[in-house]
Regions:
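Mobile active-site "lid"/loop adjacent to the S-adenosyl-L-methionine
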Residues: 21, 30-57, 61
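Short, catalytically relevant binding-site loops at active-site mouths
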Residues: 16-17, 32-34, 79-82
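Alpha-helical structural signal in soluble globular domains
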Residues: 1, 87-91, 119
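S-adenosyl-L-methionine
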Residues: 1-24
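A conserved beta-strand element that flanks and buttresses the S-adenosyl-L-methionine
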Residues: 27
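Conserved Class I SAM-dependent methyltransferase catalytic core
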Residues: 52-109, 113-114
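SAM/dcSAM-binding transferase cores
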Residues: 106-152
Length: 152
């Protein structure tokens, strides 16, 4: 890959991760369920429930690890967006991009893709995408994004 010398992937709890150099990009799909019934599978519950990684702890670590020009991107349920953005703001990070994802055109967005940076002010870029058309087919956007992953 042309990125082999430039990309590092770490599979570890962010609470235990330390790196003095900092990162230009941090991507997360953090646990987000709060005060809800937990799955009996403890690994699955830890991956989904925010008590294993509260938003405050995530942003504390992101703020420490992100370079001054870096971008933090996250996938968040739409109902958690306000709290997530507020927590980012407490740690000096502002939303620069938001993309709301609808499963179909008739349904409300279920997920939001958020990008944060340290740069203050400016207007947030906001878009919306649909995964599946009303006829059940993948949307043009989703097909273009994922077509290389399908077996032909």
């Amino acid at each position: 890959s042309r990125f082999a010398g430039r990309v590092e992937v770490f599979e570890t709890a962010i609470q235990q991760f330390h790196d003095a150099a900092g990162f230009d990009s941090i991507v997360s799909n953090p646990p987000f369920f709060q005060n809800s019934l937990k799955n009996p599978d403890t690994r699955r519950a830890a991956a989904r429930h925010s008590d294993s990684l509260p938003f405050s702890m995530l942003f504390e670590k992101v703020a420490a690890l992100l370079t001054s020009d870096g971008v933090f991107s996250a996938v968040i349920p739409t109902e958690c967006v306000s709290a997530f953005i507020a927590e980012g703001s407490l740690h000096g990070l502002s939303v620069v991009r938001r993309c709301d994802v609808r499963t179909t055109p008739r349904k409300a967005p279920r997920r939001s893709l958020l990008a944060f940076s340290r740069r203050a002010g400016g207007e947030m870029e906001r878009t919306e995408v649909v995964l599946q058309e009303t006829n059940g087919q993948r949307s043009e956007w989703y097909d273009a994004l994922t077509h290389d992953f399908y077996i032909r």
